[in-house]
Amino acid sequence: MISWINGDLVDLWQTNQKSFVLINCQGLGYEIQILESFFLKLKTNQISTKNITLWIKHIKKEDSDLLFGFTSKDQKNFFIEILSIRGVGSQIGIGILNKFSISEVINAIKTQDKKLICSVPGIGQKMSERLILELKSKFKSEILSEEEKSKDEFEIKDPEIIKMIEDLQLTLQSLSYKNKEINTILPIIIKEIDHLGKKENSLSFEKLLKLAMHYLDEDSSNKDR
């Protein structure tokens, strides 16, 4: 089994929306499917075509051997975890990593964002539900780590500001904004509170409400485009 390779680029091409490289490693040519982002960097000479190192997932089939190359071990391991899910093939795995970073996928799993997962070609509603369910158990520690990080980053200790945020949530709910939408913009508002608090002597509820509605309406208009 091939698990890692280092060599020089001989050729690169795309076919059927798949990206490939041919790597010369000690006189042998290895055809490897790679992520589109890495392909574009090679094509536009953003990175050297010499001494390319790829972490390889080697898949053996009856009639062929398939090599998938990744620029980091984390990408390779994430790809392997995706392939362990029933009904998910290699091209779905590549499609997910072509579209999102690992942290973006983990965040989508944490928030159960089926719409985001379904935006990957080949993934339907049922598969997105299965992916979220199974990956949530596989990446439990990563999800908990992200939640703790988020909690530490946005923890508020000032009782007056806590009360202001609670009032803001209730007011936005009374204005028919959904809880999911409100929770999405709260971290932004909390950052703004910190910024405004340093810049101005006092914070006004009216100013925060106006700011929150601006972000919510902007987010809504972007989704409608």
UniProtKB/Swiss-Prot annotation:
Region (Domain I) location: 1-71
Region (Domain II) residue spans: 72-150
DNA-binding recorded as keyword: yes
Compartments reported by the entry: Cytoplasm
Subunit (UniProt): Homotetramer. Forms an RuvA(8)-RuvB(12)-Holliday junction (HJ) complex. HJ DNA is sandwiched between 2 RuvA tetramers; dsDNA enters through RuvA and exits via RuvB. An RuvB hexamer assembles on each DNA strand where it exits the tetramer. Each RuvB hexamer is contacted by two RuvA subunits (via domain III) on 2 adjacent RuvB subunits; this complex drives branch migration. In the full resolvosome a probable DNA-RuvA(4)-RuvB(12)-RuvC(2) complex forms which resolves the HJ.
Similarity comment: family membership: Belongs to the RuvA family.
Record protein name field: Holliday junction branch migration complex subunit RuvA
Provenance organism: Prochlorococcus marinus (strain AS9601)
Gene designation per UniProt: ruvA
